[in-house]
Amino acid sequence: MAVDVVEAIRRLQDPSSARRRSAAKRLERLSDPSAGPALLRALRNEVLDPRTWETQYRMTMALGTCGSPSDLPHLRTLVVRPDTLHAVRTAGGDAVLRLSHMEESHPEAIRWCLDTGDEVLVGGALQAVAMLRLALDEETTTDVLDFVEARSPQDGIYFWPAVAAAGWSGQRVHAFLTSCVSGPRSDVAEAATSSLAGSYGTYRPF
């Protein structure tokens, strides 16, 4: 285990939330699977304090890059709890998708997120789809666009599918992107314009 990883894992137990958050962010970048168990333990403790939502977000995002599919049951339970914070549900959707992708089961993970009806969770999953540049099969793409287009074009749920669609194909996708270009949100229009040109742009999650 690299020295940087060992030190970051140690700091997950620091009394300071800011230092724990910094450690989680570093582990997210390092993407070392040896940190997965420590991150899961730290996250279980962290979610007990709603004041540390930023730290919870970073730990959840880090679990998505350092964890394993065996962490999915805990993550899925966490993100559907009624008291789980908005930021953690966003990161949870991202992490569920990433860990599922390790087993090539991301289409099932997307459908699971869609079935919850939680726009925040779905947005997190689509954020990961965009960052991983995943091509989706036609059925999954249709399910995603049905979910998104049932919402107002003013809704932020449109942004990440507009980015991710750079790697999708089909008439439905083209119609969605064309609609986004003329829609009310400038960020979505910009992302859709790039996707129509086959470019993912340089967007990054928080």
Regions found by a protein language model. Name each.
Residues 1-11, 30-47, 68-81, 101-115, ...:
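Amphipathic alpha-helical scaffolding segments comprising HEAT/armadillo-like alpha-solenoid repeats
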Residues 15-17, 47-52, 82-85, 117-119, ...:
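Short inter-helical turns and helix N-cap capping residues of alpha-solenoid HEAT/ARM repeat scaffolds
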Residues 16-19, 39:
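A short linear-motif detector with a strong N-terminal bias
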Residues 1, 10, 18-33, 53-68, ...:
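Structural detector for internal amphipathic alpha-helices that build alpha-solenoid repeat scaffolds
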